C-alpha cells in the first residue's frame, strides 16, 4: 500500500475531479451534507476557513487550503473489497495519519498533528484508467472544526506509507522518509 499527501492550492478542482470522475464512488463525506455538488463542498470548506481566518492566518486566505491524499492498496490487498472495506481503510488511514507527530518535519509545534477526523472531507473511490486498480482520493479542509490550520508545509515531500510485513506500528503501516 502506498499513499501520499500534500497541501494544495487547487482544492476546488481536486474535489471536482474526485467526485465527478467517471465511475467514481463516494465512500464518505465527513461533516458535509450528502448529495451536494463538489462546488458546494468546496464552498462549505471556504466558509469555515473564512469564519476562522483572523485566528489562523491573520485574516488572509490560506494559499494551500486543502489537504489532498491518495491511497493505493495493491490489487492483491484490495481484491474483493466491498464499499465497507474501503470505508474502513479510509477511517483507519485518517486515524493513523492524525496520530503522526509532524512537528519535526515542519519545525513548528503548531503543526504537531493533523485533525482530519474533525475536518470536512470527501473520500472517493477511483479506478485507474489504464490498469483498473482501485484507489482512494481524500480531499480535506486544512482548517478543522476546532479553528486550527493543519500542516503548513507540503506533506508530499518524502512522506509515503507502505504496508510492510516486517516493521509495523500497531496499525500495520510504516512511514518511509
For the regions a protein language model found, what residue spans apply to each?
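N-terminal nicking endonuclease/strand-transfer module with a His-rich metal-binding environment
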Residues: 1-177
